[in-house]
Amino acid sequence: MKKNTDSEMDQRLGYKFLVPDPKAGVFYRPLHFQYVSYSNFILHRLHEILTVKRPLLSFKNNTERIMIEISNVKVTPPDYSPIIASIKGKSYDALATFTVNIFKEVMTKEGISITKISSYEGKDSHLIKIPLLIGYGNKNPLDTAKYLVPNVIGGVFINKQSVEKVGINLVEKITTWPKFRVVKPNSFTFSFSSVSPPNVLPTRYRHYKISLDISQLEASNISSTKTFITVNIVLLSQYLSRVSLEFIRRSLSYDMPPEVVYLVNAIIDSAKRITESITDFNIDTYINDLVEAEHIKQKSQLTINEFKYEMLHNFLPHMNYTPDQLKGFYMISLLRKFLYCIYHTSRYPDRDSMVCHRILTYGKYFETLAHDELENYIGNIRNDIMNNHKNRGTYAVNIHVLTTPGLNHAFSSLLSGKFKKSDGSYRTHPHYSWMQNISIPRSVGFYPDQVKISKMFSVRKYHPSQYLYFCSSDVPERGPQVGLVSQLSVLSSITNILTSEYLDLEKKICEYIRSYYKDDISYFETGFPITIENALVASLNPNMICDFVTDFRRRKRMGFFGNLEVGITLVRDHMNEIRINIGAGRLVRPFLVVDNGELMMDVCQELESRLDDMTFSDIQKEFPHVIEMVDIEQFTFSNVCESVQKFRMMSKDERKQYDLCDFPAEFRDGYVASSLVGINHNSGPRAILGCAQAKQAISCLSSDIRNKIDNGIHLMYPERPIVISKALETSKIAANCFGQHVTIALMSYKGINQEDGIIIKKQFIQRGGLDIVTAKKHQVEIPLENFNNKERDRSNAYSKLESNGLVRLNAFLESGDAMARNISSRTLEDDFARDNQISFDVSEKYTDMYKSRVERVQVELTDKVKVRVLTMKERRPILGDKFTTRTSQKGTVAYIADETELPYDENGITPDVIINSTSIFSRKTISMLIEVILTAAYSAKPYNNNGENRPVCFPSSNETSIDTYMQFAKQCYEHSNPQLTDDELSDKVFCEKILYDPETDKPYASKVFFGPIYYLRLRHLTQDKATVRCRGKKTKLIRQANEGRKRGGGIKFGEMERDCLIAHGAANTITEVLKDSEEDYQDVYICENCGDIAAQIKGINTCLRCSKLNLSPLLTKIDTTHVSKVFLTQMNARGVKVKLDFERRPPSFYKQLDKVDLKPSFLK
């Protein structure tokens, strides 16, 4: 089918972003931002954090100081590849070493004398072990010369015992916009955080809160716990900015609605009343008095001048090197937002908006942990020096303190799912889907306690700020993660920046701003504040804001600043601010540029002819004004057209209102949603369910399973899908396969395939259709003495063990077989016994229902014997296994039919799978039919006009009409078989065939939808879930089957199971199982007076309630279930009286029966 290049130019530009871009160092786009994030940490940021020189202790007015210096930081990559690490069963770590020097500085008249106290040159091979991120092709950032494995995308850490770990990205708690909160009616707070720039180490955090109560405007204060004074916000702004109150009034009132101006006047008047209430008021004296009061309150050891300098110098750490006057103007701009937000809350970004948040990526996790653990390490050294000086009178450090930085434990906890001790961020990759290597590292989630603290459920809704940057389909639809985890769209990524790049970029932007006329950037009274990462640098003339932003964006796209991901946001709506963002953790994605009402893509004439030979970075260099990288904040405050088609339908005046234009709808999906087909042609819930099922599909090998002992389920004969999307192809999901093509028929089969039941052909299974292999890890720890003990009596459980006590290779394990010898022995205290040694088997048994072959055995000998066994099992589809299409048509095997039982077409072809046809109508999955039609059309013409094999592009979300796809299928059949009549062609296009009854060999009355489709096998396997048993262990409390397959558990028999048996008329079975079972049977004595259950005291049944009242109760014995007795006892213990009352009936008397004469009639 010939492409309309003009209408698909936006689609082709979007595809250029998805494909690799070697010129820009991008070899795998989906996880590139994670690779860069981790690379920045281990190559640069780790050195910056660990390289320290600072005082530990100071004495004698700072003339004597104990100093610490950490230097010579070296990071060494491992000597082996990730595959070797898996074979050895070890982790894949880099080694970091450093040198610590502790010395004493004494200031003398001759200068500074230095005395060495202690030093340690870290050459220990286990000083700091940093889990190394495996990137695309098994590469790592420290050794890029490793061999390339094209289908290994990486993005994982190999933890100890060769377990792969993958983590999500967490939303940072600190917000870049202040948080507005209504405390109570007419009482509000405005909280914001200030964090020092990345070049300031250790990082300083300050959290401030501005409070405002309409009834007490004099108490409109700013405060911070133990780090700042509580002071009126207006007076603090006046103190810092050195302007009059009238200046502040005019600045707050400029371009504000009348209601806000009224509140501004009231706040300024309240500040005036404070100044007028103090005789000879002086702002400096006022602030100094508050600082002195705070100094006394905190009982600080510092002098008053040192205390004041620390408090005011460290005020607003993100503006650390900024003059106090700019800090004052910054506070005025915050107060403007606060007052405006009181009346117009809906126009201000709320705390759940992604505009306010940055994202923590892999590198940021390790950076945060390294920073925290280094501070703990230095704190331990300081405490040890103080203790030694106190106890011994010498400045010394124990070598144990110097050699235990604590980073190893922190990193190990991180990969075990703990970030900052309490917050879960990482989870083990379960190995059942290759796709999860992409989906998990590209997911963004909130802190688990973030929602609990805020006590808000709006965070669980699809927030408007997530539009275009997050996939609206791939979201959890049930469970605790609903609304808390979102998947990035295929065009979205997260920014990263080095400290040196940050400083250079900040310098270039400041130089550009200061290149403007001085008076135009000094409009601090009525201008638009310009901030760089929330730090105020200038205030722009309001008449120049549009020209400034337009020129800044053009220069950014042309590479003037050396960074194409700078975000510039023009905030209007009376808040009046220009925000420039350059930091890491911002969500960015490309957009098509609209300049002065023209789509720049249409203006560039040469772009269309040269596009095929260009990469995305080439387009950015040679056609810089076509595409712009836009962060989520800039997008939120910009006018963005939904699509190119809608933009071209607008008038010229309407076009001038827009700044950007979006790409087609398929680029708004994530990579998991891109594996689906035509979700916009289906009902809405099918997209969400389809994403969940696609992640549960069994795919091909994610790594060499024979060389690593880990769990996994893998497809044995995978096939590349024919109907794909561009994102599915560029992400290598298509090449790494997650299903097979099968022939399906939509029809009813003898009433067996009702609801979700499917019929599957027996010969299809025998030929390896959707066959899988299960790799399972079994791990046991055995005391060394138990492992060395010999068994006295031959046990059947040890029949698969060799003489060394380990299971044999290639042995087939069955349920009950031991995997290693574990014999516990005990000595009897009996002098007359001939043999006072007894032994018994305590080994862990193989518990799976199916036999498995032993593939590998690993043993580690320490104080215990650690045995790890890898078993393999081929598992063909059986009854109860689950399958699905890519349109969320999930089915369960209801019957395995022989080929002779299935209907066939004129060529003798029988369907591999029969699906109930009513499922299409009930679930409204039209795209499933389109997929079958397109796959069948491909089989008719698998090559394009140039003789090249070409898959069919059917994106997950597309704006193409169904008629277009029908026309494409029609052309394929006409090309391969031009002699077809119209009816035959229609049957071919719509996959309608006449099938024949296998019993009568007569054709069915109606045609059947019959064709190929890509089918997925899910990880929900019957034999993994079967826990039904007749006998076994029961819990002590409720006497129901215990839980867990490993503990031999079963399924509880409750009300729903009872209803099922009632439906089948099994009343006697219910009585036997629920009531008459020996284990559940319970004799209970009931008091007929009060209805209590009698207690048994010294073998005598008595009613406690009646005995205390000196009554003589009548106890009646009844038989009931143990569960009923436990329920009544538990309710009584909670203060709920459940009275068992007996049915009172009046006695019934029957009249005497009439006598019946049985004599023969002839004798009467």
UniProtKB/Swiss-Prot annotation:
Please tell me whether the keyword Transcription is annotated for this protein.
yes
Which SUPFAM superfamilies does its entry note?
beta and beta-prime subunits of DNA dependent RNA-polymerase (SSF64484)
List all disulphide bridges recorded for this chain.
Answer: none
What UniProt keywords are attached to this protein's entry? Answer: DNA-directed RNA polymerase, Metal-binding, Nucleotidyltransferase, Transcription, Transferase, Virion
Q: Which reaction does it catalyse?
A: RNA(n) + a ribonucleoside 5'-triphosphate = RNA(n+1) + diphosphate
Q: Where in the cell is it found?
A: Virion
Superkingdom, taxonomy of origin: Viruses
Name one process (GO BP) from the record: DNA-templated transcription
Chief location category: virion
Which Gene Ontology terms cover its molecular function? Answer: DNA binding; DNA-directed RNA polymerase activity; metal ion binding; ribonucleoside binding
Q: What does this protein do?
A: Part of the DNA-dependent RNA polymerase which catalyzes the transcription of viral DNA into RNA using the four ribonucleoside triphosphates as substrates. Responsible for the transcription of early, intermediate and late genes. DNA-dependent RNA polymerase associates with the early transcription factor (ETF), itself composed of D6 and A7, thereby allowing the early genes transcription. Late transcription, and probably also intermediate transcription, require newly synthesized RNA polymerase.
Q: Indicate the quaternary assembly.
A: The DNA-dependent RNA polymerase used for intermediate and late genes expression consists of eight subunits (147) kDa, (133) kDa, (35) kDa, (30) kDa, (22) kDa, (19) kDa, (18) kDa and (7) kDa totalling more than 500 kDa in mass. The same holoenzyme, with the addition of the transcription-specificity factor RAP94, is used for early gene expression.
Similarity remark: Belongs to the RNA polymerase beta chain family.
This protein is called DNA-directed RNA polymerase 132 kDa polypeptide
The species this protein belongs to is Ectromelia virus (strain Moscow)
**Lineage, broadest ranks:** Viruses, Varidnaviria, Bamfordvirae, Nucleocytoviricota, Pokkesviricetes
Gene designation per UniProt: RPO132
